């Protein structure tokens, strides 16, 4: 199943770039045409790059990594907070503080301070050893820290990769990530520099729906990675992770074989009537052969019954 469809990209306006006078010539290879003074991004390439980024994020999280979501522009703030919270990843959707990655040890001290302030009951003036004025100042400090660091309060180390909406606006985050050699996944609008992004997704980084769709795709990749990390299936119809897929199929076949044997024991051979139907398909006959090879003893009672 496709990660995202062409129709979804079109409906969200992912193909709209900036005006032709506002562009980066390095983006020429991602632009399909120009219409009414606006560049149209090639969505066929976008689909391919989305699949590539999706696979990278999923693999990174499956190996125990974290993805930081970054988007401080108005169009991205809600989607960044919502999707990152959904999958339990750190995010920055207000102001990017200088050194948030390159000077993380200092930032982590401020995070610890925020956690300390969260434990204080600011409404219990009588039971506190502090004055009302001191509590008010501490409440303001807590609110200020929560606004800038609330999204990364559970982050204990620098992330394995960062998802960035609008690399031009978030140039500080891009610079810090590149300095630390942290992979960058980002939306590339027609005015962006593709050389700064490791896993680019050509698309519109200004429309709320486009930003929301692409951020949700990244969050879905994180969710699949978390499922793979815990070894749990994504659900009916979802693909198993890597080499575990055949194992899961054989487990289902073996479970089916055990259920059939139980039916034979209970009804005295009634379940054998389904054998011709099972043999009518190649997959079922192959599974039956494997079950027969794996459990030769289970066929003996049926043979005795026929005799």
UniProtKB/Swiss-Prot annotation:
It comes from the Bacteria. InterPro entries: Ribosomal_uS2, Ribosomal_uS2_bac/mit/plastid, Ribosomal_uS2_CS, Ribosomal_uS2_flav_dom_sf. The keyword DNA repair does not apply. Residues 256-307 are annotated as: Disordered. The keyword Nucleotide-binding does not apply. One of its GO terms (biological process) is translation. GO terms for molecular function: structural constituent of ribosome. Keywords: Ribonucleoprotein, Ribosomal protein. Residues 259-307 have a biased composition (Low complexity). One of its GO terms (cellular component) is cytosolic small ribosomal subunit. It holds the Pfam family Ribosomal_S2. Belongs to the universal ribosomal protein uS2 family. This is Small ribosomal subunit protein uS2. The lineage of its organism: Bacteria, Bacillati, Actinomycetota, Actinomycetes, Propionibacteriales.
């Amino acid at each position: 199943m496709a990660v995202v469809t062409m129709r979804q990209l079109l409906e969200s306006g992912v193909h709209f770039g900036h005006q032709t006078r506002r562009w980066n010539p390095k983006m020429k290879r991602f632009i399909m045409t120009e219409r009414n003074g606006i560049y149209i991004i090639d969505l066929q390439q976008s689909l391919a790059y989305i699949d590539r980024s999706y696979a990278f994020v999923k693999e990174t999280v499956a190996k125990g990594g974290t993805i930081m979501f970054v988007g401080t522009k108005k169009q991205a703030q809600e989607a960044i907070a919502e999707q990152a919270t959904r999958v339990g990843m750190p995010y920055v959707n207000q102001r990017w503080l200088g050194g948030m990655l390159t000077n993380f040890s200092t930032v982590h001290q401020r995070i610890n301070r925020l956690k300390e302030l969260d434990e204080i009951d600011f409404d219990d003036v009588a039971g506190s050893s502090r004055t009302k004025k001191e509590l008010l100042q501490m409440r303001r400090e807590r609110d200020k820290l929560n606004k800038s660091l609330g999204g990364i309060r559970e982050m204990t180390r620098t992330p394995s990769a960062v998802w960035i909406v609008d690399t031009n606006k978030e140039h500080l985050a891009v610079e810090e990530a590149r300095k630390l050699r942290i992979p960058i996944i980002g939306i590339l609008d027609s005015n962006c520099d593709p050389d700064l992004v490791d896993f680019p997704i050509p698309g519109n980084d200004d429309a709320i729906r486009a930003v929301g769709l692409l951020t949700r795709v990244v969050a879905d990749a994180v969710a699949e990675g978390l499922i793979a990390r815990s070894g749990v299936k994504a659900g009916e119809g979802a693909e198993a992770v890597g080499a575990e897929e055949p194992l899961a199929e054989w487990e289902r076949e073996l479970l089916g074989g055990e259920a059939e044997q139980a039916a034979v024991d209970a009804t005295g051979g009634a379940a054998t009537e389904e054998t011709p139907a099972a043999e009518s398909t190649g997959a079922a006959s192959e599974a039956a052969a494997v079950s027969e090879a794996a459990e030769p003893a289970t066929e003996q009672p049926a043979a005795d019954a026929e005799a």
